[in-house]
Structures are given as structure tokens and as C-alpha cells.
């Protein structure tokens, strides 16, 4: 009788499973196959651990958050480390991290010692904008370089000389070597340009504040002569934005006689710096209402969200009617999209400068190469020619026709410049707070705008033409 060998796989007999042991031959074959397929350097008994270390364990949630003790290894849980203790540790760590973040925001301070001719911090308040002014001795040289032919370049030097004669020390010329006023208060600049604003009553209030609260008997003369300096700068194309820059938001100051040491926030949150005044330890940005423009409200743009702040200077270049005006504009538009909005807002100035910006300039000589003679050169076979690849070779390029037009009296980008803007910073809140109110400066009431939560991040000037 022939019998079949027992199977090496599990069999089902009577509803139960019976696993038969493998034979010695099968075991020997599996060992040989395992030695062939697995290299000698492979791990045989789990992961290879360094000497003296235990097996790998899962990291706990507290250890991953950095809230567990430094001496407790990851995954080491105690019976008392229940859910309530875990939540308590997480909340305490979050509060410590939040307090450290809120208590020490990053901001940068700058300090300068100045004369109090164009900036008197005692009369202004913390949060006032300060602008740095280039050395006045450089301006006459810039006028000779940039003024169009026919313009009176000496007008700028004379205007600054008359302004320096009305300063506190009586002279501020470069040859005297005395201290000069290197900072200009935004309020003083607005007061000097008071005649240029549409809100004339609010601008006159700023001028009355500067005249009444700035120390000295010749404050009105300084305002008039500084205004003449601004008009002379526009006349000679040494535009004010080329000699002024943002210095910072005023925080604290120390004055003695006609000198002042001012401290300002030049970058970062304005309200992060302590003013040292017990009544007002923090300062918000304060601006004259006549010099503040909410561009989104004017043009019907935007909605809730963060906004940018820009410092804008506008110019009118008509003969004997030169004007300069300064604004702080709030808008959600980024710098690359602001110029079209300014063109719409100050379109009248742009048209005026384009039409009348060349007045008082020496006109070109009549019939002196007015147009490039392209048709005549193309029709004459004797005219020297060269290929595009030979233009850079002087042997061929020197024989070509030279067109030398007379550009005197012709419109340029500088004659059409009507504005310039620079980014000051931003208001990162979803709903930036701009408070319109009246503040009392001594005996004068001035309409102002208070901006809260301003973060300074100044940028470069961009001219609009």
C-alpha cells in the first residue's frame, strides 16, 4: 500500500489547526539560504546601539516642545505626569515665550546734538517726525551741476546765507566753522510750506504754533527764509528730497541754551522706546492734520488691512511760482503701485510742470540739428555704414554720422518732476488707528492726526515725473 508523506504546512483536521514541525533537511536549507542572502555586516539582533546606551524610545510631547526637564531623557514619563500637569507646563511655557516676545520688541535708536533753529523738541512732542538735512555748504555746488541753462544758480546760495543769518548763533556758514542745524522738525517744515496746503486754516495753526512756542525773536523770519530756500531749491533743480532724509520719530531730548541732544527711533516700533516722561511713557506718531493724507479714502480704494506710510514731497516748477509741499500718506498700496495713485492725486501739478517746467531756460539755437536726419542718411549711398556686429569696433564706428542735438530748453525728467516719495514704515494692524483730534501746544490749538502702532522701516526716495 502506497502512502503520501505528511505535508509541511498546517492542515485542518476536524475543524482544528495543527502545525507540523519542519524536518531537519528543511531547517538546514533555510540556514544556508539565510547566510547567502544576508551579508555578514548586516544587523542580526535589532539596531546596533552605542556601548552603554539603551534601546530607542518615543519622544514625549513635552520634550518635543522644550518644556521637559533637561535631565529627563525623551520618553521618560512619570506616573504624576498626567494630562493636567502637561497642559499646565505647556501654558506656562507659552506665557513665558509670549512675555519675552512682547516685552522686548526690536527697535533701533539714534541720537544727535543739534542747534534748535529748525527743531525745538521742547515745543514739539514725542512722536514728531525728524528729518536730517544735508550740509548747506554742498547746495550751491549742486545747483551749478543740476540747474538748467538760464537758471539763477546764485539764488540758492543767497537764500541759505540769509537763513543762516537768522539762526541762533548769528551765522551758520561753512567758512565760520560753527555748529549747524542738522535736523529739521516736520512741524517746522509744514509751517514753512503753510501757503501751499489746501487746508489753509490747519496749516496756519501749525505756523502759529511754531512762531509762538519756538524760542527766539526771529522765528517768523526763519520760517520765511526757509520757505525761500525751498523755492530756490526747486528753481535750481536741487530738489529737497535729494538733500533730506528720514531721521526718526522723536522719543526724548535734553536741551541746554540753544543746543539739544535728541533721541529718536529710526527703525522698529515707535511705541517700543520709553520716553522718560511719567505721564506719557510711550509715544505715538503725531502729525499736523493738514499734512496727512489717507490715500485709500481719497481714491476709494482698499478695505481693512495693514497700511504703508510714505513721506511725499510735491513741487510746482512754474516761473516765479515755485512751491514745495510735504505730506505723510497712508495707503495699502505697495511702493511699486503708489506712483500711479500719486499721478491721479497730484495730476494738476504734473500737467503744470510738464507745460511750464522749461520756463526761464535758455532755448536751443534755431535750426541746429533739431531732428535726426534718418531719411537723408538712408537715401545717400555715400554715407558711411557698418553692420550691427561692427558697432563696437572703433575702426568702423568712428566713421558714422554724429548727431549732436541741442537739448537746452527741452523738457526732461527733472523739468517734469512733480513729486518724490519714500517709504517710512507701516501700520501692521488689520484696522490701523488714525485719531483726528485737536491738541493744545501752549496757547495754540492745532488739528493733528495720531497714528498708533507705527513700525519704522525707511526706504529710498523715488522721483515721479
UniProtKB/Swiss-Prot annotation:
Please provide, in alphabetical order, the Gene Ontology terms of the cellular component aspect for this entry. Answer: host cell nucleus; viral capsid
Designated name of the protein: Triplex capsid protein 1
**Assembly behavior:** Interacts with TRX2, MCP and capsid vertex component 2/CVC2.
Alphabetized Pfam families for the sequence: Herpes_VP19C
Top-level taxon of the source organism: Viruses
Keywords recorded for this protein, A-Z: Capsid protein, Host nucleus, Virion
Q: Where in the cell is it found?
A: Virion; Host nucleus
Briefly state the protein's biological role: Structural component of the T=16 icosahedral capsid. The capsid is composed of pentamers and hexamers of major capsid protein/MCP, which are linked together by heterotrimers called triplexes. These triplexes are formed by a single molecule of triplex protein 1/TRX1 and two copies of triplex protein 2/TRX2. Additionally, TRX1 is required for efficient transport of TRX2 to the nucleus, which is the site of capsid assembly.
GO terms assigned for molecular function:
DNA binding
Q: Which HAMAP family match?
A: HSV_TRX1
Mind telling me which InterPro entries this protein's record contains? Herpes_1
Amino acid at each position: 500500500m502506497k502512502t503520501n508523506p505528511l505535508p509541511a504546512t498546517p492542515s485542518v483536521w476536524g475543524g482544528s489547526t495543527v502545525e507540523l514541525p519542519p524536518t531537519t533537511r528543511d531547517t538546514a536549507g533555510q540556514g544556508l539560504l539565510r547566510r547567502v542572502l544576508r551579508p555578514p555586516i548586516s544587523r542580526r539582533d535589532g539596531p546596533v546601539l552605542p556601548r552603554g546606551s539603551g534601546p530607542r524610545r518615543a519622544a514625549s510631547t513635552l520634550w518635543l516642545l522644550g518644556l521637559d526637564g533637561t535631565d529627563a531623557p525623551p520618553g521618560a514619563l512619570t506616573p504624576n505626569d498626567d494630562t493636567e500637569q502637561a497642559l499646565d507646563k505647556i501654558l506656562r511655557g507659552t506665557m513665558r515665550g509670549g512675555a519675552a516676545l512682547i516685552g522686548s520688541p526690536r527697535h533701533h535708536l539714534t541720537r544727535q546734538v543739534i542747534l534748535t533753529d529748525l527743531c525745538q523738541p521742547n515745543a514739539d512732542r514725542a512722536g514728531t517726525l525728524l528729518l536730517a538735512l544735508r550740509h548747506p555748504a554742498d547746495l550751491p555746488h549742486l545747483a551749478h551741476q543740476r540747474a538748467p541753462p538760464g537758471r539763477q544758480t546764485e539764488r540758492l546760495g543767497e537764500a541759505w546765507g540769509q537763513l543762516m543769518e537768522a539762526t541762533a548763533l548769528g551765522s551758520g556758514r561753512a567758512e565760520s566753522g560753527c555748529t549747524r542745524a542738522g535736523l529739521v522738525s516736520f512741524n517746522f517744515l509744514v509751517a514753512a510750506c503753510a501757503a501751499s496746503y489746501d487746508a489753509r486754516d490747519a496749516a496756519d495753526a501749525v505756523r502759529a504754533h511754531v512762531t509762538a512756542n519756538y524760542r527766539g525773536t526771529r522765528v517768523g523770519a526763519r520760517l520765511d527764509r526757509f520757505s525761500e530756500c525751498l523755492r530756490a531749491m526747486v528753481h535750481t533743480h536741487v530738489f529737497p528730497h535729494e538733500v533730506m532724509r528720514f531721521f526718526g520719530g522723536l522719543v526724548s531730548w535734553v536741551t541746554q541754551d540753544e543746543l539739544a541732544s535728541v533721541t529718536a527711533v529710526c527703525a522698529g516700533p515707535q511705541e517700543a522706546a520709553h520716553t522718560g516722561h511719567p505721564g506719557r511713557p510711550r509715544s505715538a506718531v503725531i502729525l499736523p492734520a493738514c499734512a496727512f493724507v489717507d490715500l485709500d479714502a481719497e481714491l476709494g480704494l482698499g478695505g481693512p488691512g495693514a497700511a504703508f506710510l510714505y513721506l511725499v514731497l510735491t513741487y510746482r516748477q512754474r516761473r516765479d511760482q515755485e512751491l514745495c509741499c510735504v505730506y505723510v500718506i497712508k495707503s495699502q498700496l505697495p511702493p511699486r503701485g503708489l506712483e500711479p495713485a500719486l499721478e491721479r492725486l497730484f495730476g494738476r501739478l504734473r500737467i503744470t510742470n510738464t507745460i511750464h517746467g522749461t520756463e526761464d531756460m535758455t532755448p536751443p539755437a534755431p535750426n541746429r540739428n533739431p531732428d535726426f536726419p534718418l531719411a537723408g542718411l538712408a537715401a545717400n549711398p555715400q554715407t558711411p555704414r557698418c553692420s550691427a556686429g561692427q558697432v563696437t569696433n572703433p575702426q568702423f564706428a568712428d566713421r558714422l554720422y554724429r548727431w549732436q542735438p541741442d537739448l537746452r530748453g527741452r523738457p526732461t525728467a527733472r523739468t517734469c518732476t512733480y513729486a518724490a516719495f519714500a517709504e517710512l514704515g507701516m501700520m501692521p494692524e488689520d484696522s490701523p488707528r488714525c485719531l483726528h483730534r485737536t491738541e493744545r501746544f501752549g496757547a495754540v490749538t492745532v488739528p493733528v492726526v495720531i497714528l498708533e502702532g507705527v513700525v519704522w522701516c525707511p526706504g529710498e526716495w523715488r522721483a515721479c515725473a
